[in-house]
Amino acid sequence: SIEAPLITVLAKMEMEGIKIDQSVLMELSNTFELELQELEQEIFELAGETFNINSSKQVGAILFDKLKLTTVKKTKKKTGYSTDVEVLTKLAKTHALPERLLRYRTLGKLKSTYVDSLQGLVNKESGRIHSSFNQTITATGRLSSSNPNLQNIPIRKEEGRRIRQAFIPKEGCILISADYSQIELRILAHCAEDEILIDAFNSGEDIHARTAVEVFQVVPELLTDDLRSQAKAVNFGIVYGMSAYRLANELSISRKMAKSYIDNYFKRYAGVRRFIDAIIEDTRKIGEVSTIFGRKRRIDDI
């Protein structure tokens, strides 16, 4: 009743494709290339020597052996220094080089994965990109997209929004973007039958502001944008089972404080706590969990 009717819809989407303004991508490619060259020179000047920026081993040697920056963590095999995003983000607070390296990596990925790659995927006959939408691959039942992944075109930063400008409607049409408002939390409120969450949604309240008031125990008049932002991270973190460790990293706070946020959340939203515990208990017994539409997912060894 859900998957079968969707097959025709997805087939039409794949056949239709989406129009691309290649001139936008070509201009972006040139712009990004120039900035990458400038970043490269900045990085070499900050390092005091030239090296392979794309080599984690050489980057680690510069940061930790030469510049003596504090080691955050080793690689998985414990054979060298980790220079992943988490490490560079922390180091960027103490030195300019890690920040420039992050910028270089981000821009390089945008250029290679999106700007340059998309140009090669335009169908010569239709002038459009025809992605594949995969209906039965993900364990959760969500759609995935490939060749290219049109569900993962960046949007959060300015460069990502510029890439999206290359996607254009055919003549006489417009592109419409629609999104459910806080759909995960609304479903959570419904399934958990949590009175506080339900009341907040029915009253048209800002759910993140409400959570900030409930979890951080502040009066609405003293609520700041920063507290609301933290409450948003807590709200969505709870939905996806985020640990105190992960929340601490997300908000740049101590693990103890992150745990207190989670504990306060469950104290205020007791219905959510009961719902999560019940789902885990039932899943352990029968080895599967179902959505409100009856779609089942097998989960062993929970």
Predicted segment positions?
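Short, intrinsically disordered, charge-balanced linker/junction segments flanking boundaries
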Residues: 47-50, 281, 293-302
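Active-site phosphate/pyrophosphate-handling residues
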Residues: 5-8, 186, 234, 297
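Feature representing long, continuous alpha-helical segments
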Residues: 161, 185-186, 190, 209-210, ...
